[in-house]
């Protein structure tokens, strides 16, 4: 069954990514999409990891757009798409999708809240940015969520203290 093989490669991609082996992760995601070109879980993770590295942003945007079209109320997919738009400098568009993500997630993660702050800041809404950075800072790490690095925690605290966006 091609969908099972696709899911297997997708899981391999996630494992490689967790181990910091991004080239292998991307190869696994590519294989996953060969077996099932509509695997939206693969597309979302692949697109997000590319955006975090600021690599192949057009490819990331295309994949992420497909996930949002497939599941328009999925806050995770909306956050990924908003973040890719942010990385491409499309701040107003990013804000629109981030607002949809926030509306569709009753309990947003630290990452989503920080992304919201970053997007609002770059879209010119500095007070709203500060509000979301503070929410992110106050948010406890969920069981299934990767804990932020010390560097990430410090950067968030700097954003709050300096009331401005600080890039990764």
Describe these PLM feature segments.
Residues 10, 17, 51-52, 86, ...:
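Position-specific recognition of the canonical hydrophobic site in helix A of tetratricopeptide repeat
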């Amino acid at each position: 069954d091609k969908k099972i093989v696709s899911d297997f490669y997708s899981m391999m991609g996630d494992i490689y990514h967790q181990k910091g082996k991004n080239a292998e992760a991307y190869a696994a995601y590519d294989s996953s999409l060969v077996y099932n070109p509509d695997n939206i879980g693969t597309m979302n993770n692949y697109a997000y990891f590319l955006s975090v590295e600021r690599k192949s942003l057009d490819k990331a945007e295309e994949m992420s757009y497909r996930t949002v079209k497939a599941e328009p109320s999925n806050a995770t997919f909306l956050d990924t798409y908003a973040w890719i738009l942010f990385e491409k400098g499309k701040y107003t568009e990013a804000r629109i999708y981030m607002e949809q993500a926030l509306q569709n997630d009753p309990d947003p993660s630290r990452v989503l809240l920080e992304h919201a702050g970053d997007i609002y800041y770059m879209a010119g809404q500095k007070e709203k940015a500060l509000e979301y950075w503070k929410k992110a800072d106050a948010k406890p790490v969920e069981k299934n969520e990767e804990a932020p690095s010390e560097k990430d925690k410090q950067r968030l605290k700097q954003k709050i203290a300096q009331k401005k966006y600080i890039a990764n």
